[in-house]
């Protein structure tokens, strides 16, 4: 039986980088084929070829045994291919219904039949078990909700071949379970699926087969994962053994470096207070909508704070906007790195140096390009940022390498005191996570107070000295590392009725 989808010796070269080199594997109807590899291994590039965004420089793609070459995304869609990229593609000023039906809204004599469109969307969303308001504007939804819209858009096209790139990176547990059911249903219907994820649990839960990429090459293909240990997949991905991804080691902690008292804002149900000692890593955990990111934005001055007092090294500080926070040595690495973290049109060097340009000025007027280049090269080497050179536009880097560049930006700051990391390893492979944890530990050893917001409970348990748990817009409790385990943390994070049931 011929494969529903075949990649035959695919090659793709960008200036200075061989992104794909001789990639070949099959995906069969009724199969979920996992695709794993470090950031920059070529997984997303392959999906962009499948989706018509890139053209291969070598090899061919076959659908149902027939060679195809998609000159555009529209051609790929017309051939029954649906690709859900990690970078969300939506129109923020349009509604959920309008985004889902973009380009195919029902009309009569040039007029869009909005009532019919909304009814159709509502029925399809209900059938998929997705709770979204068809009238809501996309730009006002959370990242998780926008991601569900993107997934639903692809599924509503009834594609024969569906590729999903890190689809659960922003989803809650409930939304993830909805997605898993959709994937299982699509497999039962005979669709062919490619599933990219760095989360081992998802790969073993969903995938019949799995292919591993490293540095643009296929390292291995497994027709079944039943007898393949996780350690083997990790070693194939990164080319080395990683026995303990978190490699936590206790540190000597100093006095309270940063404290927030009575912080209040629209997203919080009651005022919140917390503190962090010098050299301490405090993990913030909670379900989607718990208010963790919103609290951090209030502390950082990104959103208006109705009340609250901030102290740094025992002295009260006034933070009304982000510039105030940065002047006091407080920085935030945001949850949505593409929208708020990077300057996509700028180079890697410019993104690394943007926060410390005041230290790179010559005569107070001109940027010292030599110092800027030396700083960028130092951190590219130190953090193993995969880029052809420092002049490469950062938008062409993988998510993990973009995140390393953002972290480099703050490592270059000489007066850093407080670092707030919001989902620092979202969508990042196991090898890059290992390196980012090294950066976090390095910052803590410098005496920085670290706040790490994460939706990955194993990460919070593995990295943190202390864990603060939020639930429904308030701080539900905190646990020292010695008392923290999955049951204790989830008992605080879940709504009280669910917590009783879970126990």
Curated annotation (Swiss-Prot):
Keyword Manganese: no
Binding site for ATP: 37-44
EC number annotated for this UniProt entry: 7.5.2.12
InterPro entries: AAA+_ATPase, ABC_carbohydrate_import_ATPase, ABC_transporter-like_ATP-bd, ABC_transporter-like_CS, P-loop_NTPase
GO molecular function: ABC-type L-arabinose transporter activity; ATP binding; ATP hydrolysis activity
Reaction catalysed by this enzyme: L-arabinose(out) + ATP + H2O = L-arabinose(in) + ADP + phosphate + H(+)
Pfam family membership, one: ABC_tran
Keyword Phosphoprotein attached: no
Cellular localization per UniProt: Cell inner membrane
Main location: membrane
Keywords: ATP-binding, Cell inner membrane, Cell membrane, Membrane, Nucleotide-binding, Repeat, Sugar transport, Translocase, Transport
Record-annotated ABC transporter domain positions: 5-240, 251-497
Subunit structure: The complex is composed of two ATP-binding proteins (AraG), two transmembrane proteins (AraH) and a solute-binding protein (AraF).
Function: Part of the ABC transporter complex AraFGH involved in arabinose import. Responsible for energy coupling to the transport system.
UniProt protein name: Arabinose import ATP-binding protein AraG 1
Organism: Burkholderia lata (strain ATCC 17760 / DSM 23089 / LMG 22485 / NCIMB 9086 / R18194 / 383)
